[in-house]
Amino acid sequence: MGVTLEGQRKESIWVLMRRQRARRALVKKIMIRPRKSVEASRRPCRAIHRRVKTLKELVPNTKTSEGLDGLFRQTADYILALEMKVKVMQTMVQVLTETNCV
């Protein structure tokens, strides 16, 4: 630090730059969230892949489906087919119970 003619302190440019750098580091530390590790960012992806794999095991003939769109379409078709089978079975039960009672 130097002294001017008027007796006031004159700070060196290097001291000012060091303070500014320290302030920036502090602001950066406060304002920017720490980044998650690569492993943490892959966890949701792994969970999705595990669920897709489970869905492929549950729905028949999905090994050859084209992407998630095809898998979801085949799953929806499979659910509709199962619903129709349930309705047919319910109708058969009603018909058979009515004929046995009469």
From Swiss-Prot:
<comment type="function">
    <text>Transcription factor that modulates the balance between cellular proliferation and differentiation in root growth. Does not act through cytokinin and auxin signaling, but by repressing peroxidase expression in the elongation zone.</text>
</comment>
<keyword id="KW-0221">Differentiation</keyword>
<dbReference type="GO" id="GO:0000976">
    <property type="term" value="F:transcription cis-regulatory region binding"/>
</dbReference>
<dbReference type="GO" id="GO:0006355">
    <property type="term" value="P:regulation of DNA-templated transcription"/>
</dbReference>
<protein>
    <recommendedName>
        <fullName>Transcription factor UPBEAT1</fullName>
    </recommendedName>
</protein>
<dbReference type="InterPro" id="IPR011598">
    <property type="entry name" value="bHLH_dom"/>
</dbReference>
<feature type="domain" description="bHLH">
    <location>
        <begin position="32"/>
        <end position="82"/>
    </location>
</feature>
<dbReference type="InterPro" id="IPR044660">
    <property type="entry name" value="IBH1-like"/>
</dbReference>
<dbReference type="GO" id="GO:0003700">
    <property type="term" value="F:DNA-binding transcription factor activity"/>
</dbReference>
<keyword id="KW-0238">DNA-binding</keyword>
<dbReference type="GO" id="GO:0046983">
    <property type="term" value="F:protein dimerization activity"/>
</dbReference>
<dbReference type="GO" id="GO:0030154">
    <property type="term" value="P:cell differentiation"/>
</dbReference>
<keyword id="KW-0805">Transcription regulation</keyword>
<keyword id="KW-0804">Transcription</keyword>
<dbReference type="GO" id="GO:2000280">
    <property type="term" value="P:regulation of root development"/>
</dbReference>
<dbReference type="GO" id="GO:0005634">
    <property type="term" value="C:nucleus"/>
</dbReference>
<keyword id="KW-0539">Nucleus</keyword>
<dbReference type="InterPro" id="IPR044549">
    <property type="entry name" value="bHLH_AtIBH1-like"/>
</dbReference>
<comment type="subunit">
    <text>Homodimer.</text>
</comment>
